[in-house]
Curated annotation (Swiss-Prot):
It catalyses: 4-amino-4-deoxy-alpha-L-arabinopyranosyl di-trans,octa-cis-undecaprenyl phosphate + lipid IVA = lipid IIA + di-trans,octa-cis-undecaprenyl phosphate. Its EC number is 2.4.2.43. The chain crosses the membrane at residues 7-27, 81-101, 111-133, 137-154, 165-185, 204-224, 255-275, 288-308, 315-335, 346-366, 382-402, 406-426. PANTHER family: MANNOSYLTRANSFERASE YKCB-RELATED, UNDECAPRENYL PHOSPHATE-ALPHA-4-AMINO-4-DEOXY-L-ARABINOSE ARABINOSYL TRANSFERASE. It comes from Shigella sonnei (strain Ss046). One of its GO terms (molecular function) is 4-amino-4-deoxy-L-arabinose transferase activity. Catalyzes the transfer of the L-Ara4N moiety of the glycolipid undecaprenyl phosphate-alpha-L-Ara4N to lipid A. The modified arabinose is attached to lipid A and is required for resistance to polymyxin and cationic antimicrobial peptides. HAMAP family: ArnT_transfer. Its main location: membrane. This is Undecaprenyl phosphate-alpha-4-amino-4-deoxy-L-arabinose arabinosyl transferase. InterPro entries: ArnT_tfrase, Glyco_trans_39/83, LipidA_mod_glycosyltrf_83. It is found in: Cell inner membrane.
Length: 550
């Protein structure tokens, strides 16, 4: 009966965090709008080989992530949940692997359930796992690969070892098809310390080639198809998206070596109090094979991405699966022997909640700021934000009431965040970061437009997805579409600022022409170097400028 209650609680937890509130949050640009539109175009065109964005070739990532996103929109429709369905599914599958692997290591159902709940409630996992990017997919394949390798190395027969390594190759191949060759580097780096300490080189060299073969066979069909359709894909993807992004001096998202330290700290909430003890206990028990494996899985990718010049928080998502298992194991030990770390965790959550309450007041209309984040008419959003942090502090306090029994309720600290964050976003943020909000406000003007031009790729993708059209034209800036715009068949999909007046004269009689521009809050629209318009509609950071036929 207790197991049934735990399962019901887990399903309720998943529903409240990962299912019910997802549709209440508008899509963020540039990431969510980009991936939503790529998948919409894939469904509309039926082309499941070459990814396109705004009808242009888009070679920043391989195809597998777009497949999953497209299936999500196919099943649930072109809506907020449909766009995010793929990443939620991948996150829940990763949690299922955490459950399975924890059971495999410790044969403890309670520990397995706890590891799963910790993983799903970690701030970084929840933030990325409900956000339509490709990282939850690659995290799933990496976690699946680590589970497959362990399965292979623990097998006692050649058939079991062979099956494990073949499965490892398939997961690595799918990882390559999701986000590239990092799906090969990360698992190799993660397992090497364990292989070295356990002296398991023989099995690795005897059976490792099976993983190589299955990986190649997994990638080969699509790899050959894309090479035949677009011969430049692999050159661009390998050189620009791998070498330049991670290693060269002009790498994207450059950050210092210590960048991931605050990411780990913030990402570990609401379980931050367990982080030092989990890592220390893991190191202290390093003679235990499974603990070494989890430590290596956690630390090696962190070191690898810390050395790389290009860094983003999403890159280390897979590390938190192993960290959740270490935390769960340590938490049960602490509850049994010395609950000090659990008390500290409760106080950290209380402190975080109260800090958020104070910060919300400071940036509210009633705070000391001359330009508050929320305006007076958005009072309900301020109260939603207060509720988020109040619930965080409340559950932090509740874990202290009988810490040996109630400490696990820290998993409910982010409950307010999950349910209310979509209702607390300030209008000034929505107007710049949520193109759907802009489309709602300007639908009647946008819908009949013959041509729509914009200077932001993220806004362009949002307009295209909301209006169900892929012919948005880039104005003044090419952004990440620069490569696709270089192809001869993309002629006419970009208009520079100097060319706009002539372009307008040539096309004005064909129908309504709409410019959607991103501007600074204090920027004077009249100072824009554009021909006089027939209509202007400013929505804070986004401006709709319209030209009608004469």
């Amino acid at each position: 009966m207790k197991s049934v209650r735990y399962l019901i609680g887990l399903f309720a937890f998943i529903a409240c965090y990962y299912l019910l509130p997802i549709s209440t949050r508008l899509l963020w640009q540039p990431d969510e709008t980009r991936y939503a539109e790529i998948s919409r175009e894939m469904l509309a065109s039926g082309d499941w080989i070459v990814p396109h964005l705004l009808g242009l070739r888009y070679f920043e990532k391989p195809i597998a992530g777009y497949w999953i996103n497209s299936i999500g929109q196919w099943l649930f429709g072109a809506n907020n949940f449909g766009v995010r369905a793929g990443v939620i599914f991948a996150t829940l599958l990763t949690a299922a692997l955490v459950t399975w692997f924890t059971l495999r290591l410790w044969r403890d159902k309670r520990l397995a359930l706890l590891a799963t709940v910790i993983y799903l409630s970690l701030f970084i996992v929840y933030a990325i796992g409900t956000y339509a990017v490709l990282d939850p997919f690659i995290a799933f394949w990496l976690v699946a690969g680590m589970c497959s390798f362990w399965l292979a190395m623990q097998a006692q027969t050649w058939k079991g070892k062979s099956a494990g390594f073949l499965l490892l190759g398939i997961t690595c191949g799918m990882g390559v098809m999701t986000k590239g060759f990092l799906a090969l580097a990360v698992p190799v780096l993660s397992v090497l310390p364990w292989v070295a300490t356990q002296k398991r080189w023989k099995d690795l060299f005897i059976y490792g080639w099976l993983a190589v073969i299955s990986c190649v066979l997994t990638v080969l069909p699509w790899g050959l198809a894309i090479a035949q359709r677009e011969p430049d894909f692999w050159h661009y993807f390998f050189w620009v998206e791998h070498i330049q992004r991670f290693a060269l001096d002009d790498a994207q998202h450059r950050a210092p070596f210590w960048y991931y330290v605050p990411v780990i700290i913030a990402g570990s909430l609401p379980w931050l109090g367990l982080l030092p003890g989990a890592l220390y206990t893991g190191w202290k028990n390093r003679k235990h094979s499974a603990t070494v494996y989890l430590l290596s899985w956690t630390i090696m990718p962190l070191l690898f991405f810390s050395v790389a010049k290009g860094k983003l928080p999403t890159y280390i998502l897979s590390c938190f699966a192993s960290l959740a298992m270490l935390m769960a194991h340590y938490a049960l030990l602490a509850a049994k022997n010395n609950p000090l770390a659990l008390r500290i965790n409760g106080w950290i959550n209380i402190a975080f909640g109260f800090t958020g309450i104070i910060a919300t007041f400071v940036v509210s209309p009633w705070g000391p700021m001359n330009t508050p984040v929320w305006q007076t008419f958005e009072s309900y959003k301020v109260f939603c934000a207060w509720s988020i942090f109040s619930l965080w502090a409340f559950f932090g306090w509740y874990t202290l009431t009988n810490v040996e029994k109630t400490w696990s309720f820290a998993a409910l600290c982010p409950l307010g965040l999950a349910l209310l964050v979509g209702f607390s976003i300030p209008d000034r943020v929505m107007e710049g970061k949520h193109p759907q909000f802009f489309v709602e406000m300007t639908q009647e003007s946008l819908q009949p437009s013959r041509y729509i031009l914009t200077d932001s790729v993220g806004v362009a993708a949002g307009l295209a997805w909301s209006l169900q059209r892929d012919d948005i034209i880039m104005y003044r800036q090419t952004g990440e579409l620069k490569y696709g715009l270089n192809y001869p068949d993309a002629k006419g999909r970009f208009v520079s600022g100097d060319e706009f007046a002539n372009w307008l004269n040539q096309h004005r009689q064909e129908g309504i022409i709409t410019l959607v521009l991103s501007v600074d809050r204090d920027e004077d629209i009249n100072s824009l170097a554009i021909p006089p318009a027939d209509a202007i509609d400013r929505q804070e950071r986004l401006v709709l400028i319209q030209y009608r036929p004469k």
